[in-house]
């Protein structure tokens, strides 16, 4: 099997011609469809890239909004805690003031009661003393005193007691 140069050149020309005819047929009938498919694929890839970029930008925006919401929530929580502390302090101050006021009121009532009891006791002692003084004076003098003399004697005796 020996191949000559003429056969090789003939085969080369035949194959080259077939390829050229095939390329011309492809260009005439299929190249538009192939180019359209490639163009559609290129557009689809470009759209996918644009959508991915838009999704990335949206995600960044949502992240920023989430951070802002988180900071706002933290700030609001801090304000709520601070308001609760202030309310607690105000209630503490109010309760202490009310307790102090109630203690002062009870102290004043107790002092009034003490003064009243003291006055009653002094009055009772004065009455008892005046009765005893009159009785003693009657026994010493041996006679009953009239009301004016009795009153004068009691007043003098009480004045002497007050000075002592």
UniProtKB/Swiss-Prot annotation:
SUPFAM superfamilies: F1F0 ATP synthase subunit B, membrane domain
UniProt keyword Signal, yes or no: no
Membrane topology summary: Single-pass membrane protein
InterPro entries, sorted: ATP_synth_B-like_membr_sf, ATP_synth_b/b'su_bac/chlpt, ATP_synth_F0_bsu_bac, ATP_synthase_B_chain
GO molecular function, one term: proton-transporting ATPase activity, rotational mechanism
Record flagged with keyword Transmembrane helix: yes
Subcellular location(s) of the protein: Cell membrane
NCBIfam families: ATP_synt_b
Family according to the record: Belongs to the ATPase B chain family.
Function: F(1)F(0) ATP synthase produces ATP from ADP in the presence of a proton or sodium gradient. F-type ATPases consist of two structural domains, F(1) containing the extramembraneous catalytic core and F(0) containing the membrane proton channel, linked together by a central stalk and a peripheral stalk. During catalysis, ATP synthesis in the catalytic domain of F(1) is coupled via a rotary mechanism of the central stalk subunits to proton translocation.
PANTHER family from the UniProt entry: ATP SYNTHASE SUBUNIT B, ATP SYNTHASE SUBUNIT B', CHLOROPLASTIC
Quaternary structure (record): F-type ATPases have 2 components, F(1) - the catalytic core - and F(0) - the membrane proton channel. F(1) has five subunits: alpha(3), beta(3), gamma(1), delta(1), epsilon(1). F(0) has three main subunits: a(1), b(2) and c(10-14). The alpha and beta chains form an alternating ring which encloses part of the gamma chain. F(1) is attached to F(0) by a central stalk formed by the gamma and epsilon chains, while a peripheral stalk is formed by the delta and b chains.
Annotated protein name in UniProt: ATP synthase subunit b
Native species: Streptococcus equi subsp. zooepidemicus (strain MGCS10565)
Gene that encodes it: atpF
């Amino acid at each position: 099997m020996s191949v000559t140069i003429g056969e090789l050149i003939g085969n080369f020309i035949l194959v080259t011609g077939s390829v050229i005819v095939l390329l011309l047929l492809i260009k005439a009938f299929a190249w538009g469809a192939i180019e359209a498919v490639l163009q559609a694929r290129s557009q689809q890839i470009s759209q996918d890239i644009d959508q991915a970029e838009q999704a990335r930008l949206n995600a960044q925006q949502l992240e920023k909004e989430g951070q802002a919401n988180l900071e706002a929530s933290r700030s609001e929580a801090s304000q709520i805690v601070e308001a609760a502390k202030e309310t607690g302090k105000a209630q503490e101050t109010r309760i202490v003031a009310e307790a102090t006021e109630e203690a002062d009121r009870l102290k004043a009532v107790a002092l009034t009661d003490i003064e009243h009891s003291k006055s009653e006791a002094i009055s009772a002692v004065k009455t008892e003393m005046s009765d005893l003084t009159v009785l003693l004076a009657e026994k010493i003098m041996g006679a009953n005193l009239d009301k004016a003399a009795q009153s004068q004697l009691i007043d003098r005796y009480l004045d002497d007691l007050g000075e002592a």
